[in-house]
C-alpha cells in the first residue's frame, strides 16, 4: 500500500442540504384551479387535482390508476404501480368519488384519459398560465400532507395514504403554518 501522512480529503467540507421551500396550495388557489380545470379540454384535470390535494396521489399514480382498482362503495383505490414499487390501498374523498363518476369510462380502463406525463404536464402548465397559480402539481402532495396534519391525522395515517416510507421525507412535505399553531395554543 501507499503511505499518506494525512487524509487528502480532510480539507473538503460536507455540503449542507439546501433549505427546503415550504409551499402549499391555498384554498382560494385550489378553488381557482378547480374552476378553470373544469373548463379545460382535458376533462380529467379537475379530478387529477382533487386526487393530489385530497388523496395525496402522485402524478404517475393518477395516470396509471385503473377503474377496476377503484371501489366506489368503500371509497378506496388500490395503487398497483407506485414510485417506490410497492402497491398500497388508499381512501378516496367523497368529492373525488363524485367527480370520478362523472367521467366517461376509457376503453383502456384508466380513470383519466391522459396518455403520458408529458401530456399531463402540458395541460397542467396551461392551467397555471390561465390561473396565475404558479405552484407545481407536486405541491398538491405537500398540500395534502399539511392539511391532514392540521386536521389531526397521525403520522402513520398520512404516511399510509401518501405512500411515504421515510419519516424525514414526510416531514419535508408537512408545512404547519404559525397561524395554525397560535390558534391551537389559544384553544
Model segments located where?
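Basic, alpha-helical nucleic-acid-contacting "clamp/cap" segments
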Residues: 32-40, 71-115, 126
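Basic, Lys/Arg- and aromatic-enriched nucleic-acid-binding interface segment
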Residues: 4-59, 63, 73, 83, ...
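Conserved hydrophobic residue
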Residues: 3-4, 154
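Catalytic-site neighborhood detector that most strongly recognizes the C-terminal catalytic loop/helix
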Residues: 20, 24, 81-85, 95, ...
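Short, solvent-exposed alpha-helical surface patches in well-structured domains
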Residues: 11, 32-33, 64, 98-102, ...
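Short, basic (Lys/Arg/His-rich) helix/loop patches that form interaction surfaces
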Residues: 35-45, 55, 90, 105-111, ...
Amino acid at each position: 500500500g501507499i503511505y499518506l501522512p494525512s487524509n487528502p480529503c480532510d480539507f473538503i467540507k460536507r455540503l449542507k442540504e439546501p433549505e427546503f421551500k415550504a409551499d402549499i396550495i391555498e384554498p382560494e388557489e385550489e378553488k381557482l384551479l378547480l374552476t378553470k380545470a373544469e373548463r379545460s379540454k382535458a376533462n380529467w384535470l379537475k379530478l387529477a387535482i382533487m386526487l393530489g390535494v385530497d388523496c395525496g396521489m402522485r402524478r404517475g399514480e393518477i395516470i396509471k390508476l385503473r377503474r377496476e382498482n377503484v371501489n366506489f362503495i368503500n371509497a378506496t383505490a388500490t395503487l398497483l404501480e407506485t414510485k417506490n414499487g410497492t402497491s398500497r390501498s388508499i381512501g378516496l374523498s367523497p368529492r373525488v368519488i363524485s367527480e370520478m363518476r362523472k367521467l366517461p369510462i376509457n376503453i383502456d380502463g384508466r380513470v383519466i384519459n391522459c396518455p403520458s406525463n408529458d401530456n399531463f404536464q402540458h395541460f397542467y402548465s396551461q392551467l397555471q398560465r390561465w390561473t396565475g397559480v404558479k405552484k407545481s402539481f407536486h405541491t398538491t402532495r405537500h398540500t395534502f400532507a399539511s392539511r391532514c396534519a392540521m386536521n389531526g391525522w397521525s403520522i402513520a395515517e398520512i404516511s399510509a395514504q401518501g405512500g411515504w416510507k421515510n419519516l424525514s421525507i414526510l416531514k419535508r412535505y408537512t408545512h404547519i403554518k404559525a397561524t395554525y399553531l397560535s390558534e391551537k395554543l389559544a384553544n
